[in-house]
């Protein structure tokens, strides 16, 4: 069974393509099994939240990071959770 890893994804996207196009850079931490799934998550995230087409998202760098290297404390704490009881 594969282990879930953390990926740091850097890139740029074209926001507001139809009205006033603006190219913005982004940095996002993603949990995925491999790089391919991390890239797919980025495309689906920006597509659903901001209505950005895949061809307007340019991924410049993707790198695997360790759990200790994650800058956001909330993400580190969520990564330690084994199960959720509802």
Curated annotation (Swiss-Prot):
<protein>
    <recommendedName>
        <fullName>Large ribosomal subunit protein eL20</fullName>
    </recommendedName>
</protein>
<dbReference type="GO" id="GO:0003735">
    <property type="term" value="F:structural constituent of ribosome"/>
</dbReference>
<dbReference type="InterPro" id="IPR028877">
    <property type="entry name" value="Ribosomal_eL20"/>
</dbReference>
<dbReference type="Pfam" id="PF01775">
    <property type="entry name" value="Ribosomal_L18A"/>
</dbReference>
<dbReference type="InterPro" id="IPR023573">
    <property type="entry name" value="Ribosomal_eL20_dom"/>
</dbReference>
<dbReference type="GO" id="GO:0005840">
    <property type="term" value="C:ribosome"/>
</dbReference>
<dbReference type="GO" id="GO:0006412">
    <property type="term" value="P:translation"/>
</dbReference>
<keyword id="KW-0699">rRNA-binding</keyword>
<dbReference type="GO" id="GO:1990904">
    <property type="term" value="C:ribonucleoprotein complex"/>
</dbReference>
<keyword id="KW-0694">RNA-binding</keyword>
<keyword id="KW-0687">Ribonucleoprotein</keyword>
<comment type="similarity">
    <text>Belongs to the eukaryotic ribosomal protein eL20 family.</text>
</comment>
<dbReference type="GO" id="GO:0070180">
    <property type="term" value="F:large ribosomal subunit rRNA binding"/>
</dbReference>
<comment type="subunit">
    <text>Part of the 50S ribosomal subunit. Binds 23S rRNA.</text>
</comment>
<keyword id="KW-0689">Ribosomal protein</keyword>
């Amino acid at each position: 069974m594969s282990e879930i890893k953390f990926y740091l994804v850097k890139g740029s996207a074209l926001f507001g393509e139809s009205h006033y196009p603006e190219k913005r850079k982004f940095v996002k931490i993603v949990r995925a099994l491999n790089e391919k799934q991390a890239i797919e998550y980025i495309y689906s995230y920006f597509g659903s939240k901001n209505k950005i087409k895949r061809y307007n998202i340019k991924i410049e760098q993707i790198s695997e990071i360790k759990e200790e290297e994650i800058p956001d404390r909330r993400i580190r704490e969520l990564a330690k959770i084994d199960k959720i009881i509802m």
